[in-house]
Amino acid sequence: MVKIQPDEISSIIRQQIAQYSEEVKVVNVGTVFQVGDGIARIYGLEKVMAGELLEFEDGTIGIALNLETKNVGAVLMGDGLAIQEGSSVRATGKIAQIPVSESYLGRVVNSLALPIDGKGAINSSETRLIESLAPGIISRRSVHEPLQTGLVAVDAMIPIGRGQRELIIGDRQTGKTAIAVDTIINQKGKDVICVYVAIGQKASSIAQVVNSLEERGCLSYTIIVAATADTPATLQYLAPYTGATLAEYFMYKGRHTLVIYDDLSKQAQAYREMSLLLRRPPGREAFPGDVFYLHSRLLERAAKLSDQLGGGSMTALPIVETQEGDVSAYIPTNVISITDGQIFLSGDIFNSGIRPAINVGISVSRVGSAAQPKAMKKVAGKLKLELAQFAELEAFSQFASDLDQATQKQLSRGSRLRELLKQAQSSPLALEDQVSTIYAGINGYLDGIPVENVRAFLVELRQYLASSKPKYGQILRDTEAFTEEAESILKEALVELTGSKN
């Protein structure tokens, strides 16, 4: 029989008492009393923060949005089918944040930055808050570096600078996404990180964009954040903030980034759905009162940082869809007032065969020529004015039978200028090609060429300059300036080519 040693027992008890810790873990727990339509109402969560993440019994995560006197209204980041009345909910004490790292480049992720492309997990050791403060006034610099889109119409007349916010607005099927994707393609080799955020789109449309970028070797510097049409409204609402957070990670490392939000109308609709289900009072077009703040706090995060912060930039190209060209609706007017200009795409122009279908008259860039290379500034000055005068004359000439020679000449040049702005999708032009195209049109070298042959002639001109006059392209690439030497080489080439045409 084992003999019990009282001394041993008492020493073990003393040891246990000495090691005892009075640490009390406080968990804020509540109970679900109503759930449905992606919304849960919870009783008992007394010390919860606005925007805090909540964890339900089945593992579903929610966000506390409405803090009321007797309950908390939360939106669910999932279907929440296993959540029942009486289920317990735990406050996590955390605000929504996502992992960030260089490994995200070339990947397709969802609104929570989790990969959905089947290429395995993404390694990251750092996280950033989805909602973070925009850079302050002292942290910024004025926009002064160009961000080339590769589209003659945009780069010449509605220039975009690094750190700018330029709205792309128009009816459905007018080529809004095409302009955005072309801009991503044109950043190849320019050390710009691109983030494409697809909100409420068909999975097939997103797959098309991914394939288009992959075919052209542009996926290596692009991140795609996808919240498809069948994802819960909460994730569609969060997707743009996730895109901005990923871009911010690179911006604060001194890199240049471009974010495309395609499109913010769908994000506003998702937010309206959430707000109405939470019984927030509806305002104009049934949107909640803070829908302006929804977009302003997102777009204000785009900036050109000061040199002290590394000089990085985030350029935002938000897209907004209009109904029947109505830019005076609630969401379009809100986003127009937040951004630094807009590119307006018209259905009528698109249907008349002019692509990209930009309405030059009401499109504007509030940054202007500060965001243009010297070469473009030199040749593009007269282009917008001449096109505006041409549009006015064209409308007038439909009613006038006999026109004087000067008017006829202006109409004939205008039709050729409009022709040189036409561009096929996914074929952005380099700066030297854009300059030669505009120079030829503005200085009358295209006047003797039939309108239907203008585009073929311009292709021939680019090929001729590349093969026979390589110095022209070299000067523009090295200096970004249209020097006297470059101008004389271009004039020489145009005389040689038009001489052979006439």
Curated annotation (Swiss-Prot):
InterPro entries reported for this sequence: ATP_synth_asu-like_sf (IPR023366), ATP_synth_asu_C (IPR000793), ATP_synth_asu_C_sf (IPR038376), ATP_synth_F1_a_nt-bd_dom (IPR033732), ATP_synth_F1_asu (IPR005294), ATPase_a/bsu_AS (IPR020003), ATPase_F1/V1/A1_a/bsu_N (IPR004100), ATPase_F1/V1/A1_a/bsu_N_sf (IPR036121)
A Gene Ontology term for the protein's cellular component: chloroplast thylakoid membrane
Residues the record marks as site: Required for activity: 363
Catalysed reactions listed for this entry: ATP + H2O + 4 H(+)(in) = ADP + phosphate + 5 H(+)(out)
Gene3D superfamilies: 2.40.30.20, ATP synthase alpha/beta chain, C-terminal domain (1.20.150.20), P-loop containing nucleotide triphosphate hydrolases (3.40.50.300)
UniProt family annotation: Belongs to the ATPase alpha/beta chains family.
HAMAP family membership: ATP_synth_alpha_bact
Function: Produces ATP from ADP in the presence of a proton gradient across the membrane. The alpha chain is a regulatory subunit.
Protein's name in the database: ATP synthase subunit alpha, chloroplastic
Organism: Tupiella akineta (Green alga)
